[in-house]
Amino acid sequence: MNNPLVNQAAMVLPVFLLSACLGGGGSFDLDSVDTEAPRPAPKYQDVSSEKPQAQKDQGGYGFAMRLKRRNWYPGAEESEVKLNESDWEATGLPTKPKELPKRQKSVIEKVETDGDSDIYSSPYLTPSNHQNGSAGNGVNQPKNQATGHENFQYVYSGWFYKHAASEKDFSNKKIKSGDDGYIFYHGEKPSRQLPASGKVIYKGVWHFVTDTKKGQDFREIIQPSKKQGDRYSGFSGDGSEEYSNKNESTLKDDHEGYGFTSNLEVDFGNKKLTGKLIRNNASLNNNTNNDKHTTQYYSLDAQITGNRFNGTATATDKKENETKLHPFVSDSSSLSGGFFGPQGEELGFRFLSDDQKVAVVGSAKTKDKLENGAAASGSTGAAASGGAAGTSSENSKLTTVLDAVELTLNDKKIKNLDNFSNAAQLVVDGIMIPLLPKDSESGNTQADKGKNGGTEFTRKFEHTPESDKKDAQAGTQTNGAQTASNTAGDTNGKTKTYEVEVCCSNLNYLKYGMLTRKNSKSAMQAGGNSSQADAKTEQVEQSMFLQGERTDEKEIPTDQNVVYRGSWYGHIANGTSWSGNASDKEGGNRAEFTVNFADKKITGKLTAENRQAQTFTIEGMIQGNGFEGTAKTAESGFDLDQKNTTRTPKAYITDAKVKGGFYGPKAEELGGWFAYPGDKQTEKATATSSDGNSASSATVVFGAKRQQPVQ
């Protein structure tokens, strides 16, 4: 290896200085002093980089909106009840996407009825196991699907409801009546890779729920036989929605499917999503469809960032000075959604109209594949191997849009975490943990303002999901909070606490650190006679994590000899162990890399705290917007305990597989990871050098910022 940094280290005694950048929230600034020559070493500082824009939509597995019911007590009635952005409820990680969202389902299960306690739902969803009903699902139910785009695996959207009993409280002048339920979309396996280019057609279904207003009806959509739109929300699953075609016997060539369907085009090369939301009309013999087989109500336009998209929905069936008897008359500036599936095969979305009159959810997918794996006829193109179904050619190369990994310390395993293209939001066990304080920059998720108003380089905190806090008190499952209740198992009577240390305040698109899961048993769980103070705390697992928003491959630089500097977390063992945390302090854990983008090579070194010789050297090759390589210790090994002067145990790592990526708009940041469980070679070296019996092992995550010379 011809590494000038390593060659220089062999001739001179480097002194490293690592200090925080006062104005930039922490900086990696390591400078060496050559004792053989008086010339000063070059000084570096972090490059300035564009900070992430504030994200109105923080992403998630899915969202639901509940139907409204208006108080219509004479003389004390509410004139209207609008929909609000705050009405969106996170669904959490679904048990299975085809099943109803657990949180919202448990709410509706408790709704009282006058006799019919069935939960009715979209025909393609899994029937409810509700003890008193069959959920109204059956083979003869009306259809709702886009032709040729029916076999969803990762995302489902739909509706479910009960014929709720009227709420009558005459002493408080209150009467509410009408159905109670939700519309929703939710998915699993948010996409880590998407097609790098090309245009792909997605089709699916969409659903709506309206506000309530005295005297309001939507006769072009729903027959207001029970005062839908007036006393309670009109919605796409209402039994009086009679104007969309739901039956195969009346399907026409110009129909795109059954019910309310979507037709979207995703231009992955230009990161754009466009499309339309339509109704497939039931009959030409009425005045609601202008003698067409389909009626378009919205056009969608969104920008794709990572595996998420945000944009607008424009109402297309509206005219000035004309009253429409449907709710789709206002544009929306709140369209958001995301891609699900290993290659972005499916997507889900939602929006609320700007007039707060209607909320919409939907799901769409690429063309269904036939049994032989080819896309069904009529597609814009069959998928090539390695591409999403419906992609247009063999050129459907995939690109990685994010990294999110967890490395366990006890068994040295690496597993993928879910992520919604937000490095500042950790998703573990279906629970979303904000890594940065609410009052910080860039959409409430940036720097940690620490002591004396300064910026802390790393942040340490504890996070207890709201659901678990309540479960610990009541021992029952809770609903509606922005967490996934009990997704990691039965937490009733327990409080699961996550201890997190995250680095670094000068990294905007990359976050990495330490994660510890703890279960605190309640007094009842700890023992019948125990007091709350006696509740036992069990440390479940300690691990490391890294997640980052990958640079667009078209934006990867072509420069040579680009310097990145940063820090790292490490755990190294061979019987005894050494651990070190990220730091910007002088003598702390240090990382330095030289990247030759032109030749697609990366070399680097990780140096442990209070050491001069590097702990690991790393060599790798750049592939697209990421890199792979190997890490190894020096031939003399790594001293695990410097204080043991007579018999210092050592670790020998010969061939640890490193993976990583470049992050930010212009590859301003890089990071990577490796977990090395040991091998026969290191076991032999360990036994020879330190008289041990176990193979050396290591777990490491690292991150660094691009540097520029100090002017």
From Swiss-Prot:
Residue positions of covalent lipid attachment, annotated as S-diacylglycerol cysteine: C21
Keywords, sorted A to Z: Cell outer membrane, Lipoprotein, Membrane, Palmitate, Receptor, Signal, Virulence
Region forming the signal peptide: 1-20
Pfam family, one: TbpB_B_D
Keyword Cell membrane: no
Comment on protein domains: Has 2 lobes, each of which has an 8-strand beta barrel flanked on their N-terminus by a 4-strand handle domain. TbpB stabilizes the TF holo C-terminal lobe's conformation.
Compartments it resides in: Cell outer membrane; Cell surface
Designated name of the protein: Transferrin-binding protein B
Principal cellular location given in the protein's record: membrane
Lipid-carrying residues in chain (N-palmitoyl cysteine): C21
Membrane-related topology note: Lipid-anchor
Annotated function: Neisseria acquires iron by extracting it from serum transferrin (TF) in its human host. Acts as a TF receptor and is required for TF utilization. Involved in the initial capture of TF. Helps select only those TF molecules that can be used as an iron source and concentrates them on the cell surface, maintaining the iron-loaded status of the TF C-terminal lobe until its delivery to TbpA.
Species, as recorded: Neisseria meningitidis serogroup B
Start-end of Low complexity biased regions: 373-393
